[in-house]
C-alpha cells in the first residue's frame, strides 16, 4: 500500500488525477492532512512504512526537523525502513536520533538525503 500525505487539497486532487491517468485505481491512499497529523494517524492504525519520502516546500525548512524528529520517535519506521528527504542542496536537514543520514545525492539545486536507523535490535551500530 502506498500512502500519499498532502495538506493541499489541490495537490491531493492532482495526485489522484495522475494516478487515475496511469490506470492506477487501487493500492494507494491519499491522506489529506499536514505531516504531523498524518504521521499520528498512520502510527495509530499500526502501519509500518518501508519507505518514507519527504518533500515539504523548500521554504518550510523548520518542517524537516520536526518531521524527522516525529518519524524517529514513531512506530511507523521498522528496523529496515528508509526515509528520503528532498531539499535544497544548500540546506542541511540534519539528523534525528536514531535516524542517521547514510547518503546524499545532489542534482542541480536539489538534493536527496537518505536516512535509516543507526542501531539494530540489539543496539549494535550499523
Regions found by a protein language model. Give the residues of each.
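Class I S-adenosyl-L-methionine-dependent methyltransferase catalytic core
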Residues: 1-126
Amino acid at each position: 500500500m502506498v500512502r500519499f500525505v498532502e495538506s493541499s487539497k489541490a495537490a491531493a486532487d492532482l495526485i489522484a488525477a495522475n494516478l487515475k491517468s496511469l490506470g492506477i485505481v487501487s493500492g494507494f491512499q491519499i491522506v489529506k492532512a499536514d505531516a504531523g497529523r498524518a504521521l499520528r494517524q498512520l502510527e495509530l492504525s499500526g502501519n509500518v512504512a518501508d519507505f518514507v519520502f519527504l518533500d515539504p516546500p523548500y521554504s518550510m525548512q523548520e518542517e524537516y526537523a520536526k518531521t524527522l524528529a516525529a518519524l524517529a520517535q514513531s512506530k511507523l519506521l521498522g528496523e529496515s525502513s528508509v526515509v528520503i528527504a528532498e531539499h535544497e542542496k544548500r540546506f542541511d536537514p540534519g539528523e534525528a536520533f536514531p535516524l542517521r543520514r547514510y547518503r546524499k545525492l545532489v542534482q542541480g539545486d536539489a538534493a536527496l538525503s537518505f536516512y535509516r536507523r543507526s542501531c539494530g535490535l540489539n543496539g549494535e551500530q550499523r
